[in-house]
């Protein structure tokens, strides 16, 4: 009460100054956006921007998508642009490819890329090869997107990574986002591209929130296809990855930093065309290389990176052989303990890095 009465006796201006001193402004909290919402936002902006863009796939319309990635789009754009299809990947992928040849820009969603094998003829023979076979006269501006790679408890037929499969095929562009910024920027670039683009998302990342920088909130935000990003600077070893394992690599780098090992972590973002310039420049700086992926080891993304390093100028800068961290060379088991041991974990990445550095 004494403090209050003291304030009452003071002139009003002085009281105002005293009260102001008790408060201070803090920077606003960074906007957090999930990967799911980032993809949704990117598709929404492109649907609004270009009336030739439309989305089709199983349960993408009234149900808002099996993973709710297309939430709200059917209510906003209606039946003509958000189209539910029968359970026939070969059928609706063929419709989408034909629409692209006719001048539209379809987004073809596979409920999982494991099911894209049902439509492989449409993706490879019709979409990927037509521009070449027509002598550049017939572009096929189509996006094939959906979850790729390991999920949780969905076993052998729903857990495969197709990065190497589609990255193998000329005529396709293949992107593999990790965080929300990647997801929005790459889906928008894919939709605007005049070539067929495969967008390999990850089911386990859909609900993960990431800081969303102001530039990513713009409707003009794009991430160029074919350009990697250095997520963490380092001097001792280069660690290259894509999709969900990028997060594991950053966790491993944080652990090793406490031991005096500084890892340079590269988020590939694009599988094809691969940004070898960024990878080579990093290897020339660190003199060591580890690749990390969730797919099988033989003929994988890591194998391609290692081969190109061996064939290129960075090879002479290596102080030790490059090491790959991959999924196990088996179909994905159902039991959780076996599943966990079939995909790269943080401990596996740390082990590989220490092996490469001989520590």
From Swiss-Prot:
Required co-factors: thiamine diphosphate
Residues holding thiamine diphosphate: 89
Recorded GO MF terms: metal ion binding; pyruvate dehydrogenase (acetyl-transferring) activity; pyruvate dehydrogenase (NAD+) activity
InterPro entries for this protein: PDHB_mito-type, THDP-binding, Transketo_C/PFOR_II, Transketolase-like_Pyr-bd, Transketolase_C
One cellular component term from this protein's GO annotations in UniProt: nucleoplasm
Catalytic reaction equation(s): N(6)-[(R)-lipoyl]-L-lysyl-[protein] + pyruvate + H(+) = N(6)-[(R)-S(8)-acetyldihydrolipoyl]-L-lysyl-[protein] + CO2
Keyword Transferase part of the UniProt annotation: no
EC number: 1.2.4.1
Pfam families in alphabetical order: Transket_pyr (PF02779), Transketolase_C (PF02780)
Protein name as annotated: Pyruvate dehydrogenase E1 component subunit beta, mitochondrial
